[in-house]
């Protein structure tokens, strides 16, 4: 009897998750095919944010090429222009000491498509952090973990926004084609 109940519950769970459109992480194609090979430039090429972005791109099957190999600028380029971390007091204890911080990570990046304009991408990630004055060492370790999670989340958002860049590029191409169709034919000057 237990076996049948367990099988029924498991089968029902699989049916519900499959029917509602739920997909496991990494099973959807987040990066357009035009961007499956690209270059990555950063203001801090070996920093933790750039490493997180590089890892997220590789998780999405993006081949990263060195700038030296793309001398003719024929590949799309993701450029991390800058990032900023900010910490604001969210709540205080009765004695006036900070009880909770709201941490913000902002990332400004650009995608440069070959022969096109650049497309700006801005990402912000927010987290709250409880500041317990009795556990100073644990507080520092927890802050480091939260910052690393924020960088990973910002990298995931950057990769997701590559789809919007692709959609904007396609819309620009469609608009250019429509404008070319609407242009009246140029009069030909009579030959003398």
Curated annotation (Swiss-Prot):
Pfam family membership, one: LptE
- Write out the GO MF terms: lipopolysaccharide binding
InterPro entries (alphabetical) = LPS_assembly_LptE
Q: Per its record, how is this protein called by name?
A: LPS-assembly lipoprotein LptE
* Compartments, record wording: Cell outer membrane
- What's its job? Together with LptD, is involved in the assembly of lipopolysaccharide (LPS) at the surface of the outer membrane. Required for the proper assembly of LptD. Binds LPS and may serve as the LPS recognition site at the outer membrane.
**Which positions are lipidated as S-diacylglycerol cysteine?**
20
Origin: domain of life: Bacteria
Gene name of this polypeptide: lptE
Instruction: Supply the source organism for this entry.
Output: Sodalis glossinidius (strain morsitans)
